[in-house]
Structures are given as structure tokens and as C-alpha cells.
Amino acid sequence: MSKHTVLGFLDECSPQTTANTQRMWSFDRTPLVKNTTKIRANTFAILAVNGTSIATFRERSKQEDIREVLREYKRANPSKRLVIVLDNFSSHHAILVRQYAAGNNIRLAYLPPYSPDLNPIEQIWRAIKREVSATFIRDDEHLTATIIAAFERLAGKRTYWEKWVVKFLRPKYASKMLGQ
């Protein structure tokens, strides 16, 4: 990969207020304030190793939505060749998505079936869900703001993608990505 190529990891997730990913011990019975209203945000994100990461919200996860996410990512990383690692969700394989990618200097690299753990962005989703679970979410806007703030903070950490780069890229490309 050249310096003109940006490596990214795409995935979608729907953090919601009713998920319980937060655990705690309490001997004094600390009161827990929890919002029981179900609010969810269908979130798409691309974690960029050496470019600009994005997170956006869509109503659905259809092929048109995936194309729009790719379009937004291309705008965030103009005049770059994009390599995007993604899972085998049916909308990711749609002709509309593949045609858009082919016409805009985007290479889609699909993970093997049933291997979501190979996508480093999954760990970011786990951390975001934990944060949402521990936060009293007032409304849709508060949920989306919480997700964006967490994603922006977490996307800047190399620990999410560093091992993937070392394990799956050739050494000369890995050293370029890691700035060595």
C-alpha cells in the first residue's frame, strides 16, 4: 500500500438504551438510574488506519445506505485510493455498492464468513455499547452525540487496529502503516 492508499474497516451497529452491557458490584446498594425507554441509533462507521474515520447514522442498512456511507468516506479522504475491509452482510455485496466502489477508486476486501472478530471496529462497537449502557440517555440526539463522541475518542487509538495490521499485512506495508 502506498502513502496514497487509506486502509479502513467498515461495519454497522445499533447501540440502544435497553442493552445491559454494564456490570458492577455494590455492597451498599448504590442506586442505578436507568432509562427504560428504548432508543436506538443505526450507526455506520469506517475506522481509518491512516486517514479520516467517519461515523454516520442511517434509518436502514440497505445497499443505498452503504453506498452513501462509502460516498461520505470518499469525501473525507479525497484523492486517495481506499481499501475497505468489511464483513459479508448482503448489502455490502450488492451490485450498486460494488459499482460505486469500482468507479471511485475503492477496493472492498471481504472478511471470511462468520468471522466478525477479524474486524477491529467490532471492539470499538463493544466499547461504545458499554458506554451507552452506563449513560442515562435522554433522547435520540443525546444518544447520537454520545455515540459520535465515543467513536471519535476511540478511533484515535492505535490499539484497535495495530495487531491486525501486523498480522494480516506484509511486513513492508505494516511498517508503513505503523510509521516505522
Question: Model-found features: residue ranges?
Answer:
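A structural signal for short coil/turn segments at secondary-structure junctions
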Residues: S2-K3, N77-P78, N104
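Extended, low-complexity cationic-aromatic segments
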Residues: M1-R71, P171, S175-Q180
